[in-house]
Amino acid sequence: MWLKSLLLCLYSLVLCQVHAAPSSGKQITSKDVDLQKKYEPSPPATHRGIITIEYFDPVSKSMKEADLTFELYGTVVPKTVNNFAMLAHGVKAVIEGKDPNDIHTYSYRKTKINKVYPNKYIQGGVVAPDVGPFTVYGPKFDDENFYLKHDRPERLAMAYFGPDSNTSEFIITTKADGNEELDGKSVVFGQITSGLDQLMDAIQYTETDEYGKPQHELRFLYFVLEILKISNILDLHAAYTEKVEKFRNGDVSVGSTLENIFRNDKAYTPLTTSTGTTAYDLNHPISRALMCLTVLGLCFIAYKGMHEKPHTVSLRHK
């Protein structure tokens, strides 16, 4: 009887594991980005830098780091870029209503990535979790403009909490064909220019709960930022806006592509494949289901063996 009960329990477990396994639908990765597609020209960069993201690798069961280079567009959204750049460097501040000698440094360094939505964006950058919304202008600041569009992957943009409600939080988009649904809501202020494969192939598929909260440590570890000193920046911006108007009027010849953005890193092995989630992780639901099936099969063999009638062979001598 105990074997029958065990078999029933294992059968139920197998059903649960198979039901919990992800579908075999194709995941969107860096390979799905059309590198030849023409986009609006990019503004002249006023800042360049590197963001280091620390994330949990489910294959090696260890923490890894990904370096993403980026550029900021201060000629288009100077106020938004200034807020991001200052928090990347770190600012000293005294919170209103508290001891004026109680000075704290607030920066993006080691802040958590608190939301991850595959094929949409990752979001983080809460610099003062014990205080509340924080910017270099006060708790919040208004939307500057929506001139730059979410027309391509890896846009740097402000996290959306409603009109004119920008805080320190920002997003990095991961949708292969752009997040046009965010146009007119989230202010774009920059672009990731390398490290896109790690972001799109691994980081955006980190394990989360039903609300998009990462199940393992995921954070912006370091920021390195450089202000570019360009003497003719105003002339470059004027030439840029002229090209944008031509592009929006149908002249795609002035557009730019993403062909040179993706870096060629042969040492990096993506965690996902073109057919879906990898299943060689022992904690993966499919792997657990296969192990359950194996145990189920062994139990069945044992059960069958115990109930088979023995075959008696006579060894008597005549």
Swiss-Prot record:
Record's bilayer topology term: Single-pass membrane protein
InterPro entries in alphabetical order: Cyclophilin-like_dom_sf, Cyclophilin-type_PPIase_dom
Keywords assigned by UniProt, alphabetized: Glycoprotein, Isomerase, Membrane, Rotamase, Signal, Transmembrane, Transmembrane helix
Residues carrying sugar: 166
Membrane-spanning intervals of the chain: 286-303
Its EC number(s): 5.2.1.8
Annotated signal sequence range: 1-20
Catalytic activity: [protein]-peptidylproline (omega=180) = [protein]-peptidylproline (omega=0)
Pfam families hit by this protein: Pro_isomerase
Cellular component terms (Gene Ontology): cytoplasm; endoplasmic reticulum; fungal-type vacuole; membrane
Function: PPIases accelerate the folding of proteins. It catalyzes the cis-trans isomerization of proline imidic peptide bonds in oligopeptides.
Protein name stated in the entry: Peptidyl-prolyl cis-trans isomerase CPR4
Protein species of origin: Saccharomyces cerevisiae (strain ATCC 204508 / S288c)
Gene name as annotated: CPR4
